[in-house]
């Protein structure tokens, strides 16, 4: 039976028409510039276009002849002796690497390669040029896998086929039948040579229903036999994610790159297919066969070309649906027909996701779907793609090229928007940061790097300190105050994301069931250590920047989040700021800093009171008990504030100053110098209050603010926006002492 003619698909025709349109547009532009020779140029351009179409037809005929030859040709032939065979093989290679092969051609050539009818050398060359023009039929892959059971191909051919299958995974139009072969692939793990590549394929295929106890036991046996191999750890981690009770061994908590794709033979070809599918360029992209080198990756970055367009997996093969597809009750909605959020809600049960899952990142509607459905396999595939993109596509990134930097920033901004939308950080971004931070100068892509840092998933402090904080600390100490403030804001956002995750996990499921294998107490220890580390950074920064008002404001902004952990997040943790932070804020010359400090003290008091009440009511079941050290520290801060601001009795507890030193200053009324009236940051408010009360009195006497005027002055401060002072006074000062204070002041 003759092989049907391998015609180009509609997408290739569209590409040719796009090329025609682009030529016409260029011609019109040129026509305006040079009207004299336009007729001749039009004829030449039309002639060249006709020649190009004629050449395409000749190439198509040559490819059809070559494919028919391989399908019907002799069973055994030598490349060195058979010139016809070599000619047809070169034809297939040239077409594959320039334009890609149609699904029908791939179907035939896969059978030829895996049947071994032409020998191992030719099978290897055919597999290396199996590059799709647009997509690969699932039926072709299933038939190719069936040849593995016959034993006609060599071990090297099997390895190359699995490598090809992993590389082309996203271009296969369906995965249902391939997933039904999961058991066959799993059995192939017993082959030591195939094991790394089969693990990679299974990592892409595995769903929750594929995780079975006998398979978990087999993986554990393989690990005991082969040791802690990265590919086995990857599959075990995935199994443990879906079924934590089946995997009892400890695995690395930190996600990493388990599979090395740096030797992927088809990396340039895959990029060309993505660009071609989106119509980025009309002309074929000539690529070199072989592994990708670092130099060849230094191409122009364009994040639109990295992320494929949203297209249904069945878009290219709607006309070839089987009888089973027509009779099936499962009517899926192609993603390209999804136009509105109500339409998403109506079809959320039958939405057909694209085979290239990374295209989801460019669709807000599909991100809504990912967020609602919570399908772990989708997130895993997204994370896998992002991991490979960041680790391999971005290693060539040149910071001295402004255009590349701008496009790279746009790509990172897109990733950040997706993480904010999903309210979840990708482990692949975390691995990228850990790899990049040791080389980061603290300036390039600063905003993007810090935003990515804020979405690092929760983990123990002992793990992130050497990977993250130890690299950030030198930059923090040696950079400008603006970098210090930006990093403090980033760490505040990181803490907030951790707290939200922990509070949600504590409500949804016990912490012992979480993927991090940690108890609530262990999680709180990590959060506490992070806060204490940031407190240490703050103390050093205050000394380096001479208690800068801007810096102290960002530090207190961080502790506004810390002081409300118990009440706002329902987590058993209270951590106070260091004394250096307290005294720098209290002695600041900026009134807003003092107001912010009083508000934080008010919130600390509420959190400690709530924790104490719960501890007394449920003493036997108490989640935690407040240490006496925390209570003593808070009481010291509280007493210092009340004595200085209200009672005018500073330096009575915790601080001792030699009376001779005070006498040498010549200041006899020093006890009043830090109260609400005489505090350096409040002097202008006190003077303004007196001028409003008695405009004719000059000069003003601050000592006159006593008795009723004291209360009026406080009301004046409240009207100026000092609500932190107001809340602190109402919550921490005994109102029975007001009359006594009025007399003493």
UniProtKB/Swiss-Prot annotation:
Q: Which Pfam families match?
A: CENP-I
Provide the record's note on post-translational modification. Sumoylated. Sumoylated form can be polyubiquitinated by RNF4, leading to its degradation. Desumoylation by SENP6 prevents its degradation.
Keywords of this entry = Centromere, Chromosome, Nucleus, Ubl conjugation
| BP-aspect Gene Ontology terms | CENP-A containing chromatin assembly; follicle-stimulating hormone signaling pathway; mitotic sister chromatid segregation
Principal location listed in the UniProt entry? nucleus
- How is this protein annotated for GO cellular component? inner kinetochore; kinetochore; nucleus
Polar residues: compositionally biased ranges: 1-27
Q: What induces it?
A: By follicle-stimulating hormone (FSH).
Record-stated family: Belongs to the CENP-I/CTF3 family.
Q: Identify the PANTHER family for this entry.
A: CENTROMERE PROTEIN I
- Known function: Component of the CENPA-CAD (nucleosome distal) complex, a complex recruited to centromeres which is involved in assembly of kinetochore proteins, mitotic progression and chromosome segregation. May be involved in incorporation of newly synthesized CENPA into centromeres via its interaction with the CENPA-NAC complex. Required for the localization of CENPF, MAD1L1 and MAD2 (MAD2L1 or MAD2L2) to kinetochores. Involved in the response of gonadal tissues to follicle-stimulating hormone.
The protein depicted here goes by the name: Centromere protein I
